[in-house]
């Protein structure tokens, strides 16, 4: 696992965006061989999306031959709802870059057959071979996507019940009203995530410090979903300074020295 320790949330977003752009450009995608990118929602990736849009407008990257798969979507929330992940992605990213509509893949939380929707999503991912790079965030309790604590590390795209803590955390997007936050969501599984060629997780703020410590210094444990990254051959964790509060000094020193060349110029 790589750990990229940076000072601020803005630097985390810029580093992540630069990493994605470098990966896309090195891949040299075409219509017949697109770059497949997994994407998250929430507050954490906003600076990364902003930086990606800026780099696109500066001519540094094109998303014309990029295919995206989003991590999750609420169940029962109309896709036109301002807090649906469909709306979030278009508002913060898709509407500002040159990605073709047919290349965008989002789970349908209102599908008449939820099991079929989840199965078809997995099949579509497999039809591209694999996801080349999956970017994600992490919850205070270590969840990735909506793989809450005790999720199977072999899980696939499915419906999940959201914990009360997750709904409280997400209520900030619903005027602070927990009752407005859906109780269920469709989410890619931990196994889906681990199948990606590369996984990049962004960690921001002191509320995520325990999760980061579990990911980097703890054991692989289904109660801390983020610890699954230890099983991945190409995992990158990009974090800001407040999120490193629970790490040992020698751990942080080790990664700062290891990644010194890669964190310049931000």
UniProtKB/Swiss-Prot annotation:
GO terms for molecular function: glucosamine-6-phosphate deaminase activity; identical protein binding. The keyword Membrane does not apply. Keywords: Allosteric enzyme, Carbohydrate metabolism, Hydrolase. The active site is at 72 (proton acceptor), 141 (for ring-opening step), 143 (proton acceptor), 148 (for ring-opening step). Catalyzes the reversible isomerization-deamination of glucosamine 6-phosphate (GlcN6P) to form fructose 6-phosphate (Fru6P) and ammonium ion. It catalyses: alpha-D-glucosamine 6-phosphate + H2O = beta-D-fructose 6-phosphate + NH4(+). CDD domains: GlcN6P_deaminase. GO terms for cellular component: cytoplasm. The record marks 151, 158, 160-161, 254 as: Part of the allosteric site. It comes from Enterobacter sp. (strain 638). Its EC number is 3.5.99.6. Belongs to the glucosamine/galactosamine-6-phosphate isomerase family. NagB subfamily. It comes from the Bacteria. Allosterically activated by N-acetylglucosamine 6-phosphate (GlcNAc6P). One of its GO terms (biological process) is N-acetylglucosamine catabolic process. Pathway: Amino-sugar metabolism; N-acetylneuraminate degradation; D-fructose 6-phosphate from N-acetylneuraminate: step 5/5. This is Glucosamine-6-phosphate deaminase.
């Amino acid at each position: 696992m790589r750990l990229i320790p940076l000072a601020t949330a803005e630097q985390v977003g810029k580093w992540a965006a630069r990493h994605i752009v470098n990966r896309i450009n090195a891949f040299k995608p075409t219509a017949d061989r697109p770059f497949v990118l997994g994407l998250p929602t929430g507050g954490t990736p906003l600076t990364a999306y902003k930086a990606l849009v800026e780099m696109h407008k500066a001519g540094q990257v094109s998303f014309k031959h990029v295919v995206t798969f989003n991590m999750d979507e609420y169940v029962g929330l109309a896709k036109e709802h301002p807090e649906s992940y469909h709306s979030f992605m278009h508002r913060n990213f898709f509407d500002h870059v040159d990605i073709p509509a047919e290349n965008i893949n989002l789970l349908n939380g209102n599908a008449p057959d939820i099991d079929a929707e989840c199965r078809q999503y997995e099949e579509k991912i497999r039809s591209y071979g694999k996801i080349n790079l999956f970017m994600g965030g992490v919850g205070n309790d270590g969840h990735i996507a909506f793989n809450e604590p005790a999720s199977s590390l072999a899980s696939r795209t499915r419906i999940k019940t959201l914990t009360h803590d997750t709904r409280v955390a997400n209520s900030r997007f619903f005027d602070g009203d927990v009752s407005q936050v859906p109780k269920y969501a469709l989410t890619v599984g931990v196994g889906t995530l681990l199948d990606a060629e590369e996984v990049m997780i962004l960690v921001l703020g002191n509320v995520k410090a325990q999760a980061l410590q579990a990911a980097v210094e703890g054991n692989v444990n289904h109660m801390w979903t983020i610890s699954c990254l230890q099983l991945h051959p190409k995992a990158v964790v990009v974090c800001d300074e407040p999120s490193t509060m629970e790490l040992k000094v020698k751990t942080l020193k080790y990664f700062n020295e290891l990644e010194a060349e890669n964190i310049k110029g931000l």
